Regions:
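N-terminal beta-loop-helix "entrance" segment that forms/cooperates
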Residues: 58-74, 171-172
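A generic structural motif
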Residues: 48-54, 154-155
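N-terminal beta1-alpha1 ligand-phosphate binding loop
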Residues: 19-48
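Helix-loop-strand module that forms the ligand-binding subsite of alpha/beta enzymes
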Residues: 72-153
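Short, Lys/Arg-enriched N-terminal segments with co-localized hydrophobic residues
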Residues: 9-17
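Glycine-rich phosphate/pyrophosphate-binding loop and the adjoining helix
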Residues: 18-24, 65, 155-206
Length: 206
């Protein structure tokens, strides 16, 4: 699909080649052998050259403190906000801890949600996934993630939830090796890419 632009001397919409879309990946787990990160890395490999997925680590973020925000926000926070701002869309994969998203992910979203009303996530297309050893796949965490994103307000992709149950049996050597699950996840990313293209089309046609 191409970029849609108006001709210089008419209102005719011209279809031009679209540049490679850039996605930012956020993992809700800090573990070295994180299953959530393994899913992201596998999608990173599978998406090329259709889209570029950069995985950003939330490891260095301090706990959210409004006193430390603003003009002199920590460098790691500024880096996160910049990475989100320059991405066309965001892909989040998180485990489920105690029926909710991980604390590190919630903390990252809290930092990214500020400044209020001017968040870099505002209107940004976001796709969420959860991965868990449990057969439920972290579905309760995903509901919480989408509620938080909608409140910012980001633009969560409206589609059937992508939950990966029994993930510990589907990951090996830091990669998602279950082909059916990988195809399932890639279908969701395709929907994210379509959401991004649709938003571009609306802006170009305005």
């Amino acid at each position: 699909m191409g970029d849609v632009r108006r001709g210089a001397k008419s209102n005719h919409l011209e279809l031009r080649p679209m540049t490679q879309l850039r996605l930012l990946g956020l993992s809700g787990s800090l573990r070295r052998a994180s299953n959530s990160t393994a899913v992201l890395r596998s999608l990173e490999d599978a998406l090329a050259p259709k889209a570029l997925l950069d995985v950003f680590s939330l490891h260095g973020l301090p706990l959210y403190n409004e006193d430390e925000d603003g003009e002199h926000a920590p460098e790691s926070v500024r880096a996160l906000r910049s990475a989100i701002d320059t991405a066309d869309g965001v892909l989040i994969v998180s485990p489920e801890y105690n029926h909710g998203m991980s604390g590190v992910l919630k903390n990252g979203l809290d930092w990214a949600s500020r400044p209020y009303g001017r968040s870099v996530l505002r209107g940004k297309p976001v796709l969420t996934m959860t991965a868990s050893p449990a057969f439920t796949g972290g579905v309760r965490a995903q509901q919480q993630m989408n509620e938080t994103l909608a409140s910012i307000p980001a633009r969560p992709v409206l589609r059937p939830q992508i939950v990966i149950g029994g993930v510990h049996e589907k990951v090996s050597d830091g990669r998602l090796v279950d082909e059916a699950t990988l195809r399932f996840a890639l279908a969701g990313v395709d929907d994210l890419l379509e959401e991004i293209r649709a938003a571009r089309f609306v802006r170009a046609a305005a």
